[in-house]
Amino acid sequence: MSKFSSKNINKTKVPESPVVLAILDGWGHREENLDNAIKNANTPIMDSLWHAYPHTLINASGADVGLPNGQMGNSEVGHLTIGSGRIIQQELVRITNVVKNNQLTQVNELKEMANSIKKKKGTLHITGLCSDGGVHSHIDHLLGLIKWASEEHIEKVAIHIITDGRDTPAKSAYKYIRQIEDCIKKFKVGEIASICGRYWIMDRNLIWERTEKAFVNLTDPNGKKIDISPADYLNKSYNANITDEFLEPIRISKDFLKDEDSLICFNFRPDRARQIIKALSEKEFDNFKRKSIPDVDILTFTQYEANLPVKIAFPPESLNNFIGQIVSENGLKQYRTAETEKYPHVTYFFNGGVEVPSPGEQRHLIPSPRVATYDMAPEMSAEELTISCSNAIKTGQYSFVVINFANPDMVGHTGNMAAAIKAIETVDRCIGKIVNATGEMGGSILITADHGNAELMKGPDGEPWTAHTINKVPLIFIEGEKRKIPNMGNEIYLRENAGLADIAPTLLQLLNLPIPKEMTGKSLIKEIELKGFNKVVQHV
């Protein structure tokens, strides 16, 4: 049991006014107007809030979120850092250190898989996102696995490439394929067996027909091998205006998953690897009809979901005393809401990888629109999300509310400037309504983001920029009339040079709850001039 359990803390009565955390996913800060969807959008609400209320810019990338210096942040890492109130060494760093130190041969689950493959004389299949984006995977980990397979004398290795084009430039796959081919040549093991764009195999929105298409490419014994080189396939696709993210699944060797084979998925981020691994591993599966279900041993780099019938190379480290846990153990109710694309982030990731809600934690999912890409519906489900969350706030039941607006990130990923501007303007309208609902209840609200994206829509080469950024993100604090900061005077300020890890301690201070020692972040609140909500209402 946590040291901050309800047994040893004086319980606070449920207040009539909430503390709200609004996360504008992908809303970064960048001064330049050029190629900046946020600066070019009409945002009267956010502009008014920024000028009228205490604000600061906080770090959301690199070492400030447990990633290598210069590595862009992402939604998983951002929500994990916010919810934990500390900087946690991320899986990218953890696994990279093992690979760089040539320690894959010391990983027990990899040892067991190597022995099993050699005993069965089967094929080792390796799949994962092949890029250096560092959000879901890293190509260095694949190259390390090829070297490991050579050292373990595994004879048959089939590599199933997932192309990126979302966390990397849209037409950058050839660079990574060349690295793979060079590594295969150097260590004299492996071949490229198939290619598939991440759009198909890494869906997380329960659009199972995408997953099915990738599944068939990996498993169908009657699947047709296409006589084409990876480079020629890329050129053919680019000429047809199909970029890396959307490459059609193809098989370029005779290797497919079959009985007695083994599979390693080297993605370390769970959310976009779950659906394909479920389809490949679960006996009870009804999301689509599987014509061929190969009996293969599966090893994933990290835990994608509790109780999946797979082995894990790098099991999760035990984490304790996240903000949701502290709120729950003090008898307070909390409300988490997002649309489908970001629902795992305000629940699973925000809670440190815990699937099950804490006592008193209410979750509400708003379905994302079923479109091919979100530039086709830049408003997404923000309006429905806003109505639902506003109603929850006004019930007075919840002490702590977390809402995520997905639009800046999901539409920013499309590289469509006009659509991103619409997405930003939608969120601007919606955040005003959330602020007003909070104000009506006398509550306080923190508005921030988990990482940047929509503030940069083109790269230096003039091509659409579909990845995240390393820019700082805004944070605005509005104190409610019934949610005054305990033991503070009339003037307070927000700290500068802060990071996402400082948000949870700030929220706990607003909730008048103790900050556990595990939270190494520090409250953002110093002396600032307090103002009410009256200046916001007139703009909404």
From Swiss-Prot:
Catalytic activity: (2R)-2-phosphoglycerate = (2R)-3-phosphoglycerate
Record pathway: Carbohydrate degradation; glycolysis; pyruvate from D-glyceraldehyde 3-phosphate: step 3/5
Keywords assigned: Glycolysis, Isomerase, Manganese, Metal-binding
Binding site for Mn(2+) 1: 409, 413, 468
CDD domains assigned to the protein according to its UniProt record, in alphabetical order: iPGM
Matches recorded under Gene3D superfamilies: Alkaline Phosphatase, subunit A, BPG-independent phosphoglycerate mutase, domain B
Active site per the UniProt annotation: 75
GO BP annotations, alphabetical order: glucose catabolic process; glycolytic process
Cofactor: record remark: Binds 2 manganese ions per subunit.
GO MF annotation list: manganese ion binding; phosphoglycerate mutase activity
Cystine residue pairs: none
Enzyme class: isomerase
Family of the protein in this entry: Belongs to the BPG-independent phosphoglycerate mutase family.
UniProt xrefs under PANTHER family: 2,3-BISPHOSPHOGLYCERATE-INDEPENDENT PHOSPHOGLYCERATE MUTASE
Role this protein plays: Catalyzes the interconversion of 2-phosphoglycerate and 3-phosphoglycerate.
Subunit architecture: Monomer.
Protein name as it appears in the record: 2,3-bisphosphoglycerate-independent phosphoglycerate mutase
Source species: Prochlorococcus marinus subsp. pastoris (strain CCMP1986 / NIES-2087 / MED4)
